[in-house]
């Protein structure tokens, strides 16, 4: 089973929680998750979102200017391995 999703990684937990809240207010399904190991920096938490909503997430980043963003990533789990690449 293949699971593909987006990850927004930040340097601070406070920014993760703020950005997750803003996305939810805009109707984007989100979840606070442990940051994947391939994204080695940050606070250890990230915001998970559906890849279909990547454009909404990018637009929200531009308008909310959360700061401390490490990056947006595409994560794909194929049942045995998680692969992470810049989105």
Model-derived features with residue positions:
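Amphipathic, hydrophobic secondary-structure cores in small proteins
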Residues: 4-63
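C-terminal structural segments of small proteins and small subunits
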Residues: 54-87
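Short, low-complexity, intrinsically disordered N-terminal peptides in bacterial proteins
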Residues: 1-3, 86-87
